[in-house]
């Protein structure tokens, strides 16, 4: 599990090799739009806090944990390396999930590609059925977590899945993440209060189908 999480985190940065090389640090990605661009579905205030505070905290914590892990491994301290696993998974997953989430959203997200729409109809019957199934599963997440549309490389099918907390989809299920819905309360509470279904149903209005379609095409390669 730890190896899978590390592998997913490593995809976000360019690996640096060599004994004398300086290890790269993770950084907070810029958003491909302004904080107010997703209104009225998601407010400027939520977007700014979510990005600058919550995601930034995952990035900072992840860098600190990786420093500690590097030190533990270099000293052969297996006990310390194991003790760092939960924090690595949580903060690494938070960075991975949010980096996908931002690109999954857009003011004018368009429509699924012909190839993706064909797959959706094959696996769910219709786009409407997919939206209903993913929305229902996401709303039903107990506590904090994520709802996902993922692609199963082995079965070559689309699947709906949920993950608790910040567990990264690919590292924990083997599904390639295509579209994610964040249902941590910080993602919606300032605007939607305790009515999670309203937030989940509204997010489809800003789904970036171009990005989802590109992820689907890449996942099949």
Curated annotation (Swiss-Prot):
Disulfide links within the chain: none
An annotated Gene Ontology molecular function: manganese ion binding
Localisation per UniProt entry: Mitochondrion matrix
Gene this protein is translated from: sod-2
Membership in a protein family: Belongs to the iron/manganese superoxide dismutase family.
PANTHER family linked: SUPEROXIDE DISMUTASE 2 (PTHR11404), SUPEROXIDE DISMUTASE [MN], MITOCHONDRIAL (PTHR11404:SF6)
Subunit structure: Homotetramer.
Free-text cofactor note: Binds 1 Mn(2+) ion per subunit.
Protein's name according to its UniProt entry: Superoxide dismutase [Mn] 1, mitochondrial
Record's GO cellular component terms: mitochondrial matrix; mitochondrion; respiratory chain complex
Superkingdom of the organism of origin: Eukaryota
EC number: 1.15.1.1
UniProt keyword Cell inner membrane present: no
UniProt binding sites for Mn(2+): 50, 98, 182, 186
Function according to Swiss-Prot or TrEMBL: Destroys superoxide anion radicals which are normally produced within the cells and which are toxic to biological systems.
Cofactor list: Mn(2+)
GO biological process, one term: removal of superoxide radicals
Substrates-to-products reaction catalysed: 2 superoxide + 2 H(+) = H2O2 + O2
KW Lyase (keyword) present: no
Transit peptide location: 1-24
Organism from which the protein derives: Caenorhabditis elegans
First-tier enzyme category under EC: oxidoreductase
